[in-house]
Amino acid sequence: MTAHNPVQGTLPRSNEEIAARVKAMEAILVDKGLISTDAIDHMSSVYENEVGPQLGAKIVARAWVDPEFKQRLLTDATSACREMGVGGMQGEEMVVLENTGTVHNMVVCTLCSCYPWPVLGLPPNWYKYPAYRARAVRDPRGVLAEFGYTPDPDVEIRIWDSSAELRYWVLPQRPAGTENFTEEQLADLVTRDSLIGVSVPTTPSKA
């Protein structure tokens, strides 16, 4: 296993095949006047530079320091995220799952790769692998171990299956020793993987 891609697997098509298919579809849409190349470039720039797990990290940091916001986030995640200017396509209906000392939540999309884009950006390749989609349900502790996290035996692992209608993400536990951290410092500890639930935030000593 590698640090960058703990879950091994492949997609039904190679990256080269997928890229070629996307380019062909773009060309058809542009030729038919359904979309412009400028619009495609703009959307690519947004998801590469403006949308990503850094937004989810800021929301988590706010929840860690503001109990009232945390309650709103757990009650109506979509609305609470909008308070911080986060929302939109692929995040119309979101639910946030709180990790505790006795429960660890982990998110998967067993059907395809449904994912809360406004909060986490584009999904990593491993999230789309059939191996992850199957093993997250069948052997969640084994998958977590491959990501370097081993919950205590008495911690309940809950698996949540995202769909096109409802997308889940995780509110991790706040690391110990961060009582005097600012929101910005706390956000730096939150990783994409911890928001999916396959890992936990970075500890202050490792940040």
From Swiss-Prot:
Its cofactor is Co(3+). NHase catalyzes the hydration of various nitrile compounds to the corresponding amides. Its EC number is 4.2.1.84. This is Low-molecular weight cobalt-containing nitrile hydratase subunit alpha. Induction: By cobalt and urea or cyclohexanecarboxamide. The keyword DNA-binding does not apply. Belongs to the nitrile hydratase subunit alpha family. It comes from Rhodococcus rhodochrous. GO terms for molecular function: nitrile hydratase activity; transition metal ion binding. The keyword Metal-binding applies. Heterodimer of an alpha and a beta chain. Signal peptide: none annotated. It catalyses: an aliphatic primary amide = an aliphatic nitrile + H2O. Binds 1 Co(3+) ion per subunit. Industrial production of acrylamide is now being developed using some of these enzymes.
